[in-house]
């Protein structure tokens, strides 16, 4: 079978299902692909094709994730669904599946449950910007008042974590009935798809964001000056533009006097490309791996931040023993390790392998960072955890 050519004519948006175990996330994922395929074309995916999610590795952590795709008339969606709660935690913290928006599935028969709350909190911490609610199993609830009560509880829970609970779209449906082809419930899936289109704004593409390049290597070329190499994370760098060198040391300014790729000279380097950038007036020893080149004024160096962290279990190759306050591992940001100290939440004495935990980290050197930046926690080069900057403090 020949591979279909990928038509990139429509905007691409990343979404995923979140919510409590057995509330119907995977059934809903199957229903969306099935109903949209029937209505707009595309491939339907059966429940069992999605449920036996393959393993993948992200930052040294094994995660089971299913990826499906579907189309509405205006957009192309990539959708992630995870079989187990631990997979969600790992997925969201590592950013293995960056979500532009999430579909929170809540069974009308149960209402919000512990993992409902936990996934909303995680969404807030890791920067999922939009949540749409699918109230599932509504075919099993006859009482209109009960549905209204559950809806109210969900809205309150969202508001508690700073999502706009009162304005969040809530669709009442039945994923199973829609999957079985019941027209009344299929319409609810189309209603949900409509909200995906209207409520989640089109994400800003990496190339449209301000320029940033994590420095991997530094060379000096006699007669030309200092060259830094790395993969452009976002934006575009053009010859002649000013840049800042941020992190580890005092921030310095320079001008890009050349961009090259595979030994060819270019006018610009774009997001996703591996390039060398020639810098004016910078000595080889004034710059090092772990710093970033950035558009002036767009990113600052910080040492202290609040984070959400997942600690690998022993089976995942992590630590065999818990750690306590006073733990001083390395935090690997982009291209380099920086030692840091941790503060655990009130009342938490120790952290076990396999836990996810909120912690405040203080680094010994400043690193260029914004909220949402991912990092690994390492001990002597071995990954023992993964985290995300929830909030820069200083």
UniProtKB/Swiss-Prot annotation:
Domain tr-type G: 10-204
PROSITE patterns: G_TR_1 (PS00301), G_TR_2 (PS51722)
Name of the top EC class for this enzyme: hydrolase
Catalytic function, reaction form: GTP + H2O = GDP + phosphate + H(+)
Region (G3): 81-84
One Gene Ontology molecular-function label: guanosine tetraphosphate binding
UniProt binding sites for Mg(2+): 26
Location in the cell: Cytoplasm
Ranges where the record places region G4: 136-139
UniProt keyword annotations, A-Z: Cytoplasm, Elongation factor, GTP-binding, Hydrolase, Magnesium, Metal-binding, Nucleotide-binding, Protein biosynthesis
Residue segments, region G2: 60-64
Primary localization: cytoplasm
Region (G5): 174-176
Region (G1): 19-26
Binding annotation for GTP: 19-26, 81-85, 136-139
EC number: 3.6.5.3
CC per GO annotation: cytosol
NCBIfam families in the record: EF-Tu, PRK00049.1, PRK12735.1, PRK12736.1, small_GTP
Family label: Belongs to the TRAFAC class translation factor GTPase superfamily. Classic translation factor GTPase family. EF-Tu/EF-1A subfamily.
Subunit structure: Monomer.
Primary role: GTP hydrolase that promotes the GTP-dependent binding of aminoacyl-tRNA to the A-site of ribosomes during protein biosynthesis.
Protein name: Elongation factor Tu 2
Organism: Escherichia coli O139:H28 (strain E24377A / ETEC)
């Amino acid at each position: 079978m020949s591979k279909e050519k990928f038509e990139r004519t429509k905007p691409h948006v990343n979404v995923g299902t979140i919510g409590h175990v057995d509330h119907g996330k995977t059934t809903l994922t199957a229903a969306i692909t099935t109903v949209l395929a029937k209505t707009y074309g595309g491939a339907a995916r059966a429940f069992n094709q999605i449920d036996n999610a393959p393993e993948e590795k992200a930052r040294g952590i094994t995660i089971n994730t299913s990826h499906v795709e579907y189309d509405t008339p205006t957009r192309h969606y990539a959708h992630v669904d995870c079989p187990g709660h631990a997979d969600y935690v790992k997925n969201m913290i590592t950013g293995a599946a960056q979500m532009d928006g999430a579909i929170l599935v809540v069974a009308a028969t149960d209402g919000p449950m512990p993992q409902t709350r936990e996934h909303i909190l995680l969404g807030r911490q890791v920067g999922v910007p939009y949540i749409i609610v699918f109230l599932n199993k509504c075919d099993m609830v006859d009482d209109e008042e009960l549905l209204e009560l559950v809806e109210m509880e969900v809205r309150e829970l969202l508001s508690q974590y700073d999502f706009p609970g009162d304005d969040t779209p809530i669709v009442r449906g039945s994923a199973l009935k829609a999957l079985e082809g019941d027209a009344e419930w299929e319409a609810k899936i189309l209603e949900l798809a409509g909200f995906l289109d209207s409520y989640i704004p089109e994400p800003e593409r990496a190339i449209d964001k301000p320029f940033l390049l994590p420095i991997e290597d530094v060379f000096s070329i006699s007669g030309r000056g200092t060259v830094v190499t790395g993969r452009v994370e976002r934006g575009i760098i053009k010859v002649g533009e000013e840049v800042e060198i941020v992190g580890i040391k005092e921030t310095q300014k320079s001008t890009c006097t050349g961009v090259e790729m595979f030994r060819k000279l270019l006018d610009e380097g774009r997001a996703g490309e591996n390039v060398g950038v020639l810098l004016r007036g910078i000595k080889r020893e004034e710059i090092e791996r772990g710093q970033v080149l950035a558009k002036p004024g767009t990113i600052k160096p910080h040492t202290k931040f609040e984070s959400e962290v997942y600690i690998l279990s022993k089976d995942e190759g992590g630590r065999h023993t818990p750690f306590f306050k006073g733990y001083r591992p390395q935090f690997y940001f982009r291209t380099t390790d920086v030692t840091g100290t941790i503060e655990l939440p009130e009342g938490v004495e120790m952290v076990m392998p396999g836990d996810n935990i909120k912690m405040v980290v203080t680094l010994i050197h400043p690193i260029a960072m914004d909220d949402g930046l991912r990092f690994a926690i390492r001990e002597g080069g071995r990954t023992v955890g993964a985290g995300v900057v929830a909030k820069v403090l200083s």
